[in-house]
């Protein structure tokens, strides 16, 4: 059942990605984008059911690194829909849909190549840790998407001869910068608290808070970069290209920690 639900979600994300591309290139972007958003909504529901079933039937799966990619994709969709509900920015899904497809595809490829860890390390503290960390990374994933659109649109505006390539329904630079600001304000505290629960879980599982494991070191690096973005936005009031690039860097390091470290 879990594999079937994952495959259905994967297909819907792929279909949504295709529809968004058609919507951008076509003459009726609004109607096509609505269909794409419906596909992502169904995918989100399927992933929600998948996570609930897996939590009830087999908690061991939550300690597999490849499995992390599925709740991360779920978090990305959740954050994207929250932003869509509050700000009505449909363009943010253009980045989220293909990214979720890549995450789900990677999870399905690598899921059966890992063995679960001891049952003793699985528990509520781990669930809280993963939930908050994924929420923080998911928020930054959406901010990274907004950052890509910000830098791309700014480049087109600087080269006025390319303005014809600018889609009519893309959010303004100010709107994209606002997404970045919201991400820094709420994402950093969530990630920081999630990391604290991670160290508590490590102490409960292995008897030490910090073991200089590469995963722990890069998590602190992500926290430092995330904190720097938070400082730049909330304390110094920085905006524009710098914070857009920072969001991309934070998310890139987070993806490196998941796929490589």
Which stretches of residues belong to each language-model region?
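Short, flexible active-site loop motifs that bind/organize anionic cofactors or intermediates
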Residues: 58, 121-123, 166, 207
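Active-site glycine-rich loop that binds ribose-phosphate moieties when present
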Residues: 118-134
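Juxtamembrane inter-helical linkers in multi-pass membrane proteins
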Residues: 157-174
């Amino acid at each position: 059942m879990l594999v079937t639900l994952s495959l259905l979600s994967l297909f819907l994300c792929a279909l949504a990605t295709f529809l968004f591309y058609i919507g951008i290139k076509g003459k009726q972007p609004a109607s096509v984008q609505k269909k794409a958003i419906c596909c992502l909504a169904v995918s989100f529901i399927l992933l929600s059911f998948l996570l609930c079933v897996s939590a009830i039937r087999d908690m061991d799966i939550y300690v597999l690194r490849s499995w992390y990619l599925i709740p991360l994709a779920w978090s990305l969709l959740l954050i994207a829909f929250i932003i869509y509900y509050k700000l009505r920015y449909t363009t943010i899904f253009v980045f989220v849909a293909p990214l979720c497809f890549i995450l789900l595809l990677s999870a399905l490829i690598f899921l059966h190549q890992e063995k679960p860890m001891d049952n003793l390390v699985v528990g509520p503290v781990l669930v809280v840790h993963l939930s908050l960390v994924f929420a923080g990374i998911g928020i930054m994933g959406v901010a990274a998407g907004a950052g890509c659109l910000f830098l791309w649109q700014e480049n087109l505006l600087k080269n006025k001869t390319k303005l014809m390539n600018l889609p009519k329904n893309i959010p303004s630079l100010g709107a994209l910068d606002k997404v970045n600001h919201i991400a820094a304000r709420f994402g950093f505290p969530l990630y920081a608290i999630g990391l604290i629960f991670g160290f508590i879980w490590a102490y409960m599982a292995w008897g030490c808070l910090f073991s200089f494991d590469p995963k722990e070191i890069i998590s602190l690096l992500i926290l430092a970069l995330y904190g720097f973005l938070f400082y730049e936005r909330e304390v110094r009031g920085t905006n524009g290209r710098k914070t857009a690039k920072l969001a991309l860097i934070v998310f890139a390091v987070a993806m490196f920690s998941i796929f490589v470290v």
